[in-house]
Amino acid sequence: MAYGVKIAKGDAYKRAARKRRHIRVRKHLSGSPERPRLVVTRSNRHIVAQVIDDIAGHTLASASTLDTSIRGGEGDKSAQAQQVGALVAERAKAAGVEAVVFDRGGNQYAGRIAALADAAREAGLKF
């Protein structure tokens, strides 16, 4: 089952495995106007969440640790991910979105990804 990503060693292998998982999952996930896709992008320092309507190709709402309300905030990266989850849920609800499809982007559902998802659920998004 090759997905066009070469296998390497060490950290490069982890990145390639994440890319393979993301490609595999994206074949089955798509956002619609009724249930857009909540995409989570994670780096070593920041986390970004976007609510995307794939049919129209538009981003309906977004939040990240680079937002001014979160950027200087206290706490570790998981606490900041919770703030991002609550903020993206608030902005999505303001845009008229009640339910989303969660796209973890090939990342494991643990740590910052899970913290963001739990905070978005608590703020009222359904997925």
From Swiss-Prot:
UniProt-listed GO biological process terms: translation
GO cellular component terms listed in the entry, alphabetical order: cytosolic large ribosomal subunit
Any GO molecular function: structural constituent of ribosome
Keywords: Ribonucleoprotein, Ribosomal protein, RNA-binding, rRNA-binding
InterPro entries assigned: Ribosomal_uL18_bac-type, Ribosomal_uL18_bac/euk
SUPFAM superfamilies, per the entry: Translational machinery components (SSF53137)
PANTHER family: 39S RIBOSOMAL PROTEIN L18, MITOCHONDRIAL, LARGE RIBOSOMAL SUBUNIT PROTEIN UL18M
Subunit structure: Part of the 50S ribosomal subunit; part of the 5S rRNA/L5/L18/L25 subcomplex. Contacts the 5S and 23S rRNAs.
Family: Belongs to the universal ribosomal protein uL18 family.
Protein purpose: This is one of the proteins that bind and probably mediate the attachment of the 5S RNA into the large ribosomal subunit, where it forms part of the central protuberance.
Protein name: Large ribosomal subunit protein uL18
Organism (species): Streptomyces griseus subsp. griseus (strain JCM 4626 / CBS 651.72 / NBRC 13350 / KCC S-0626 / ISP 5235)
Lineage: Bacteria, Bacillati, Actinomycetota, Actinomycetes, Kitasatosporales
